[in-house]
Amino acid sequence: TVETKADWSNGKVAMTGRSYAGTMPFAVATTGVEGLETIVPIAGIADWYSQQNMQGAQRYWPKEMLNSFLAYFCSSRYNDETLTEKQREDMAAFHHEMSLQQIKGGFDYNPEFWGMGNYRLHADRIKCSALIVQGLNDENVSTKQYEMMYKSFQKAGKNVKAILHQGAHITPTMPKRYGILVDGKFYDDIINEWISHYLYGVENGAENRPAILVQMNYDQRKWETADSWETAYKMNLTCEEQGTTVIDTDWEAAGVSAENFDDVMGVRSSNMAQRYVTDPFKEAVTLQGTTCVRLRAALKDGDAEADFNPVNSNDA
């Protein structure tokens, strides 16, 4: 037996990735594994239940509402040519059973099924730092997921920073595609500085970057910083009108097509969506933190699916 030492490694590890691969750093960090010094999750999921559902209503379209679908889609193990037929059958059986258990619980939160994928429940195990990256216009993994893990790292007393860009479900730099200058710096340079500090002890000040760095929606060349995600201020917007509104899924009546979907569903009311507009603000207001909407709804039949999307009417 010959002992092989990994002399190329100092034993310190970082994790990064986007979407499913951005979720894995959260999952590993909340195990408290030794050697994981920092993570840079991009559009990662903090809680699988709230990613797929919204308080008992389905958030995703039917096929992709199942965790097993995404687990299968993102599993590189199926491409392993050395797998035996028995191993493939066991993996398929596992994903099938996962689907059955999820369907059994419906759209309500079931701790037995969803608890393992609710990483914020294990904030006390976190031992590493985090630089969390999230798109504010990501309609796949919402900002709620970023917020939950940001608070989890704070609860654990670990250094956590955030970069919030105006993009969708993207990494701020994509090979051969595009890149976003993050406050005048290349994204890759920022990540290099962060990881170099935590893995190699480079004194570059990366750990002292702003708590929150956010790209402005009114001018995407501008970035602003904040000391925290939320503020001590609260603003309540109420509606004096009362009544009952009924919406349905009659696409033809709404005149919805692939070309006009955003206009019909996002900027005006129809039989498929209702738009509520506040009075114009008398001065510029920056919403910092979480937007909460309280409403009551009943589902007559069909899929229990609902969604809410706050929009700046000046942008619409």
Where are these predicted regions, by residue range?
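Accessory cap/linker subdomain of secreted extracellular hydrolases
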Residues: A27-R125, E203
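Catalytic histidine neighborhood in serine/cysteine hydrolases
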Residues: F153-P172
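Gly/Ser-rich "nucleophile elbow"/oxyanion-hole loop immediately N-terminal to the catalytic nucleophile
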Residues: T1-A14, S19
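C-terminal, loop-rich substrate-recognition/catalytic regions characterized by aromatic stacking residues
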Residues: G179-A316
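Conserved alpha/beta-hydrolase "acid-adjacent" motif
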Residues: E139-Y146
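Short beta-strand immediately N-terminal to the catalytic nucleophile in serine-hydrolase-like folds
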Residues: M15-G17, I42, V133
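Short beta-strand/loop motif that positions the catalytic acidic residue
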Residues: I126, I132-Q134, D138
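Glycine-rich nucleophile elbow surrounding the catalytic serine of serine-hydrolase chemistry
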Residues: G17-A27, N140
